[in-house]
Amino acid sequence: MHRPLAASILVPALLAALLPGAASAATAPAGKFTATAKVSSIDEAAAQGAQIFANDSFGSKQTWVPPNAFSSHAMTCAACHTDGGKSEGTTPAGAHLPSLIGAAAKYPKFKAKKHAVYTLERQIVHCVRAGIMGKPPAYNSPEMIDLVAYLTQLSKGATMGQQFK
């Protein structure tokens, strides 16, 4: 099943593919990103997840000023997890964040301080609440499923279960 893409999604993707460095200038303003059609494959879900990762502020009123920018931007996952999570990043406060490549393979994860097992979904909820200061997507919502698909795609080829060694 072919799913049409909105021009606001297609144009930045084409610019990013054709012109290195153009992606940041061409991205749509952050806000609420809502899936407009059902997806029929994990690749489509991951593509939607990438858009949510880059553009959804989850209702947060927080802003940040990227390096070399003249104005502030709404907080999104991409505010801290640069290059779509494919590179190491920092929070606006300066804390180091590792790349998200392989991150999905590290879940579930035991958090000793909380004596709890965190699933990937629970970690996303934590990041949206504590990092973005927004309202996280519901656990079985299309947005959560798409975010998990995106992070899982970034983990393709990673060995699962390394946290149990």
Residue ranges, per PLM feature:
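Intrinsically disordered, low-complexity segments enriched in polar/charged small residues
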Residues: A7-S8, A23, K86
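Sec/Tat signal peptide C-region and signal peptidase I cleavage site
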Residues: L19-A25
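Bacterial N-terminal signal peptides
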Residues: S8-L18
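Generic hydrophobic-segment detector
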Residues: A6-A7, V39
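Electron-transfer interface patches adjacent to heme c in soluble/periplasmic c-type cytochromes
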Residues: A26-E44, S57-K165
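Positively charged n-region of N-terminal signal peptides that target proteins for export
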Residues: M1-P4
